[in-house]
């Protein structure tokens, strides 16, 4: 069998379904206005929700961190790679996002994917049962698979269905896992119900706040803080490459949980630590997020969200009822969605097309990601340009 020919047939099948993904090349820093593939565009593709990726304070902190610590960490966190910058950042993250716990501690990871794998594989295993929302992020799904636990998927956001599954389960360890803000729909999980169910059934509750951290709650402290939730059963995962404008992720939980992860989480133990300079940039980001400037950026973003919702409601397509920076516009077929994306691109607007398997078949969509770096003039351009995709996709 020709191995390359097998892959080529698979790629041809991907093309036939309109599912080929392509990388675009950014020539400038992430921002609302940037150069991509040699063209000036207004970007609605990034997750830089507060517009901090090119913030001078973060850039200077990163540069100073590199001057002090060098370009790389030199090892894993347990074998020489854990710097003073990493340790200080973990203390800051625990204080910032750990209000749900009486004894919070944080653990910093190089990526959100690794953090989710760590939480699920270290807290659940053979004999445990994980209850996973049907629309959870791929990293959570992979974490459930790698855990070797029994996995039960409950209908999206359906706390009553989850309750029934928990009542019927006699596993010694139960773990509920959910995104807070769902990345492709922009809706928010019923977090208060999930916390109540976790406590009623003696289950862990792992929440991935990738799209809520920095944006939701007082001072951007996240979705749990937005709802005033507290519980010893909570394990909070936050991402630092979206609203925080840098890179990496973290877990905050009771100090005993974090110590268990240090000892048992393979995706933490067996990998090189992120460069200390990144931790320095994140520390600077936290200061901005919690400041008056952070409040102003969140207020501007909230106004942009409401204006975008009004714009999308005026199209003949199906906007998802999202009050977050993720604003999806469901078109349907892959072909129509790609045509809409191309028409927007021709007018200097980068709005990505999201297709299966990321979303269910027949629900391909434009995913409009908003940033505090956007202006209302940017939204006016988007509103005017949507006429062309409508005609192209009709």
Swiss-Prot record:
Its cofactor is pyridoxal 5'-phosphate. Gene3D superfamilies: Aspartate Aminotransferase, domain 1, Type I PLP-dependent aspartate aminotransferase-like (Major domain). One of its GO terms (molecular function) is pyridoxal phosphate binding. It catalyses: 6-carboxyhexanoyl-[ACP] + L-alanine + H(+) = (8S)-8-amino-7-oxononanoate + holo-[ACP] + CO2. One of its GO terms (biological process) is biotin biosynthetic process. Substrate binds at residues 21, 137, 358. Pyridoxal 5'-phosphate binds at residues 112-113, 183, 211, 239. The modification N6-(pyridoxal phosphate)lysine is found at residue 242. The keyword Transferase applies. This is 8-amino-7-oxononanoate synthase. It comes from Burkholderia thailandensis (strain ATCC 700388 / DSM 13276 / CCUG 48851 / CIP 106301 / E264). The lineage of its organism: Bacteria, Pseudomonadati, Pseudomonadota, Betaproteobacteria, Burkholderiales. The gene is bioF.
């Amino acid at each position: 069998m020709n191995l390359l020919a097998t892959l080529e047939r698979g790629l041809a099948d991907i093309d036939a379904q309109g599912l080929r993904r392509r990388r675009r090349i950014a020539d400038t820093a992430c921002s609302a206005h940037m150069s991509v593939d040699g063209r000036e565009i207004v970007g609605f593709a990034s997750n830089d929700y507060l517009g901090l990726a090119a913030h001078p304070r973060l850039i200077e902190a990163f540069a100073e961190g590199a001057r002090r610590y060098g370009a790389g960490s030199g090892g894993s966190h347990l074998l020489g790679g854990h710097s003073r910058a990493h340790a200080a950042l973990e203390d800051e993250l625990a204080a910032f996002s750990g209000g749900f716990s009486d004894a919070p501690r944080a653990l910093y990871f190089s990526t959100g994917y690794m953090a989710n794998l760590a939480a699920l594989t270290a807290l659940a295993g053979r004999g445990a049962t994980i209850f996973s929302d049907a629309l959870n992020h791929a990293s959570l799904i992979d974490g459930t698979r790698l855990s070797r636990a029994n996995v039960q998927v409950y209908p999206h956001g359906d706390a009553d269905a989850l309750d029934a599954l928990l009542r019927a389960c006699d596993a010694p360890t139960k773990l509920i896992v959910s995104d807070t803000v769902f990345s492709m729909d922009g809706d928010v999980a019923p977090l208060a119900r999930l916390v109540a169910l976790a406590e009623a059934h003696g289950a862990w509750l792992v929440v991935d706040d990738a799209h809520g951290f920095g944006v939701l709650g007082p001072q951007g402290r996240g979705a749990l803080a937005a709802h005033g939730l507290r519980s010893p059963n909570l394990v909070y995962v936050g991402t630092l490459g979206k609203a925080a404008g840098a890179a990496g992720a973290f877990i905050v939980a009771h100090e005993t949980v974090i110590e268990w992860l240090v000892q048992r989480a393979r995706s933490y133990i067996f990998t090189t630590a992120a460069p200390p300079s990144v931790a320095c940039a994140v520390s600077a980001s936290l200061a901005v997020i919690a400041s008056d400037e952070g409040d102003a950026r969140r207020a501007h973003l909230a106004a942009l969200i409401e204006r975008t919702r009004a714009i999308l409601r005026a199209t003949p397509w199906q906007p998802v009822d999202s009050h977050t920076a993720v604003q999806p516009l469901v078109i349907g077929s892959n072909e129509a969605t790609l045509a809409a994306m191309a028409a927007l691109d021709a007018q200097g607007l980068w709005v990505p097309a999201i297709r299966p398997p990321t979303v269910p078949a027949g629900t391909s969509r434009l995913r409009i990601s908003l940033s505090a770096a956007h202006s209302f003039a940017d939204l006016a351009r988007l509103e005017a340009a949507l006429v062309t995709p409508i005609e192209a996709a009709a």
